[in-house]
Amino acid sequence: MRSTGLVTVFAIVIAVLVGAQAGSSAMSQSAPAPPSPGQGRLIVYGDIALFQPPGHPENCILRNRFKRGDPVGFRMFVADPSTGKREESAQLVVHLTVGGRTVDIPMRYRATAAQPEREFWVAKWLVPQETPVGIVRFTVTATDKYGRTGEFKPFEVQASQLTIAE
């Protein structure tokens, strides 16, 4: 009877150890907690397009070459770095370098009750008549309610830069 009691105690000890190990493994395999709000850099990306009035056949066509008087459209998306989802509190500004000076253009959030699928920010710049022909450098900065920031810069490939042509 004494050996049966020892076997039972030994079996219970083994079961407890195996259970503790299984729980420990499950905990170590769970997803890590997302970072606290306010940490990380915002993810900012987008494109430029011709912003003609709605119904115009060339409205929203992607391009990088524009003429004086053309409406350049900037479209951007901002994501929270911890979730990958849209950061609705973000404030965006386009910074253009034109003729040796910087022009700042605030962006606005595009989605409306009638068009909720447009979950991006937009800004329009009418190319002034006095703008020199050539490349116009730009960046877009974003800041959210937590103080996080992010920046979009186009690729450093001359052929893909915002360019003013005759």
Where are these regions (language model features)?
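Short, compositionally biased P/S/T/A/G/V-rich stretches that sit at domain boundaries
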Residues: 27-73, 78-79, 163-166
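Conserved structural position at the C-terminal beta-strand
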Residues: 140-142
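Short beta-strand elements
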Residues: 148-166
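A short beta-turn/strand-edge loop motif at beta-sheet boundaries
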Residues: 65-68, 82-90
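Solvent-exposed serine/threonine-rich low-complexity stretches and specific carbohydrate-binding patches
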Residues: 92-93, 100-116
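Short glycine/proline/serine/threonine-rich loop/turn segments at secondary-structure transition edges
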Residues: 129-137
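Short, solvent-exposed loop/turn segments at the edges of extracellular beta-sandwich modules
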Residues: 82, 144-149
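Aromatic sugar-binding surface patches on proteins
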Residues: 114-125, 132
